[in-house]
């Protein structure tokens, strides 16, 4: 379920401060359901800061302050509202980080961990959901005979797909991805990109990437940020071929970055 306009998260006048530092300034854009939205921009522009607002990661640090709205549909809760429990937000919005970060547990236990936290204890149900998540993460065929081996025995690309399986096992409504392929080789990167495109059938995805070719390949919409401000947002094809702002064009054509 979304709003009438197919929006999953409606971001309006979002501002964010680290202490006295005004990191994000009046950010407004829609995140469309079952689409991939890429956030691009030079280092330090606020991409990851914005991404981490959506699941309240900043709440872990003292002095973090939000203003504005990030309305999650269908129930229209403000994800950054002071009265909204960040733990409940994180149950609905999953995250995959830059470097693979599997738990020091078996492959199976990595995927089952979140399910158990949510009270699922029956082995047959856990088995079914673990297999489904690993299949959805395009990893099942590679690990089905070694589920009880340590996750660290997997390659880097496999570990990242395991982290994706772990995130999607609990069926989040939105999946945040912070440069999910930056630590991977080109073959592993291609597998993850194919996987991301496949996953959007089931989950809304927001991806931060330094790799503009990646943004062009996988995303439906692109947000270009510069110095804490959203410069331009629109369909990816338009942003990359006919941007409205000169700053966007300069960044995309490599004049700065």
From Swiss-Prot:
UniProt domain ABC transporter: residue ranges: 9-252
Compartments where located: Cell inner membrane
Gene Ontology terms: cellular component: plasma membrane
Enzyme class label: translocase
Matches recorded under SMART domains: AAA
EC numbers on record: 7.3.2.1
Keyword Nucleotide-binding tagged: yes
Residues that coordinate or bind ATP: 41-48
Primary location group: membrane
NCBIfam families: 3a0107s01c2
Protein name: Phosphate import ATP-binding protein PstB
Organism: Aquifex aeolicus (strain VF5)
Taxonomic lineage from the root: Bacteria, Pseudomonadati, Aquificota, Aquificia, Aquificales
């Amino acid at each position: 379920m979304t709003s009438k306009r197919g929006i999953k998260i409606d971001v309006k006048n979002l501002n964010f401060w680290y202490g006295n530092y005004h990191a994000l300034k009046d950010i407004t854009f829609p995140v469309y359901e079952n689409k991939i939205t890429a956030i691009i921009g030079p280092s330090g522009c606020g991409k990851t800061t914005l991404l981490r607002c959506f699941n309240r990661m900043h709440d872990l640090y003292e002095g973090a302050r939000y203003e504005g709205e990030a309305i999650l549909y269908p129930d229209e809760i403000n994800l950054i509202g002071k009265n909204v429990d960040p733990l409940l937000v994180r149950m609905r919005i999953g995250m995959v980080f830059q470097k693979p970060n599997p738990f020091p547990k078996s492959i199976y236990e990595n995927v089952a961990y979140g399910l158990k936290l949510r009270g699922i204890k029956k082995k047959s149900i856990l088995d079914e959901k673990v297999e489904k998540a690993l299949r959805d993460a395009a990893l099942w065929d590679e690990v089905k005979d070694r589920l009880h081996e340590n996750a660290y025995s997997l390659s880097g690309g496999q570990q990242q797909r395991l982290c994706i399986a772990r995130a999607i096992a609990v069926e989040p409504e939105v999946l945040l991805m912070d440069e999910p392929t930056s630590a991977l080789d080109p073959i592993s990167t291609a597998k993850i990109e194919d996987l991301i495109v496949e996953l959007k059938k089931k989950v809304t995805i927001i991806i931060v990437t330094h790799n503009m070719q990646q943004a062009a390949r996988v995303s439906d919409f692109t947000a270009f940020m510069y110095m804490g401000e959203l410069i331009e947002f629109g369909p990816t094809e338009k942003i990359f071929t006919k941007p409205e702002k000169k700053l966007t064009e300069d960044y995309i054509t490599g004049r700065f970055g």
